[in-house]
């Protein structure tokens, strides 16, 4: 099911549409439009509520047909949950529930009126842009590698979702973020035999080539060797799929210093010589979701034509194993000149990132953010709801946390105290690539901090938030929303 969006200010009871979407709270209070339709239909919605057909519980919905006095042949009533707890998360869930409820209905046009609902500390533009993002997220279906019949069925159905309201800025931003999130999800969900480093580079270059103002440079292995990217290339040694460094640029801010985003692009992670085991390795196609997220953020920024300069860097590498693969106890030299003792080949993300972060210095960033599915330790600490945030800069932390709260793509700050740094000490090199059993997310952040000295830098660990686990799990597209909102706030 695909969606296209528009704004609509027509009176709901007379609008020409296949379905009007309204809400009801758990205490049986109707949304404003539900009240209007109830009055037009002679109290039909109230009667169904009294009979127990409409409970208002979050996650429930009921499709009503042919209400007297209402032009639309269908009215979808969505449960909103408890009114006093109705915040951004509940609003986003309600919109998603509405779209999922229409998946199998014979509907090609629907009017969503949930945008009229009051959401604490949010305005009308927020309601509209979050409605677009939530609806698009709920409508997403993976189809890239399905057989013809299943693909046709999954892609069938185009619904025009008219959102009740007039805040066009909210619609524009919402569509841009939704497109960026979907782009990131599409890349993240591809199997690793298709989404190789070269494929990722070529796909990204095609996007830049077809969007005026965007440019893309691809560095191959020889160029990375000339730059001295010994850490990145060490990880790449064991794979037949050769690495690429993707550099995207958007010049919307004249001569201003750019904001630089770096995303981990491990297209598949076997763990290398420290081979992963069953129960985790099968989800390692998602190890490039950091790269997918910063590319998705770039897509959103280009679509909304943000008036700033943005550079996105993705080290795209496969961590595989053959006779040439790097080993535990190897000492490698990074682009910065720092030497690194390899304690574990499955701690490869920080190795490709450290060279990419060093490369980013040449652009003199206004701020430098890296995004990575870096540590299982972060997932253990925060689960899948929150992205881990680490930085030495309180102002930057507050900017990112505020942006995440605003779009409900939230992060939680973890410390980068000096007490953790000595866990990375090495007898044989300048730094060890692992920090031991405890505080693994933090010591990974500490490792990266050694390659960002003098930079206004933050690290986002999305190991938990980048995907949903299990057989039906998928890439989430996070934190495209957080990053795009952060960039919007800088304009």
UniProtKB/Swiss-Prot annotation:
BP GO terms, sorted: proteolysis
Active site, renumbered: 276, 350
Pfam families: Peptidase_M17, Peptidase_M17_N
SUPFAM superfamilies: Macro domain-like, Zn-dependent exopeptidases
Entry GO MF terms: manganese ion binding; metalloaminopeptidase activity
EC number(s) per entry: 3.4.11.1, 3.4.11.10
Catalytic activity entry: Release of an N-terminal amino acid, Xaa-|-Yaa-, in which Xaa is preferably Leu, but may be other amino acids including Pro although not Arg or Lys, and Yaa may be Pro. Amino acid amides and methyl esters are also readily hydrolyzed, but rates on arylamides are exceedingly low; Release of an N-terminal amino acid, preferentially leucine, but not glutamic or aspartic acids
Claim: Iron-sulfur is one of the keywords in the record: no
Residues that hold Mn(2+) 1 according to the record: 269, 346, 348
Bilayer-spanning residue ranges: none
Main location: cytoplasm
Amino acids binding Mn(2+) 2: 264, 269, 287, 348
Enzyme category, top tier: hydrolase
Superkingdom, natural source: Bacteria
Cofactor, how bound (note): Binds 2 manganese ions per subunit.
Cofactor: Mn(2+)
One Gene Ontology term, aspect cellular component: cytoplasm
Compartments, record wording: Cytoplasm
Keywords annotated in UniProt: Aminopeptidase, Cytoplasm, Hydrolase, Manganese, Metal-binding, Protease
Family of the protein in this entry: Belongs to the peptidase M17 family.
Functional note: Presumably involved in the processing and regular turnover of intracellular proteins. Catalyzes the removal of unsubstituted N-terminal amino acids from various peptides.
Protein name listed in UniProt: Probable cytosol aminopeptidase
Record organism: Xylella fastidiosa (strain 9a5c)
Gene: pepA
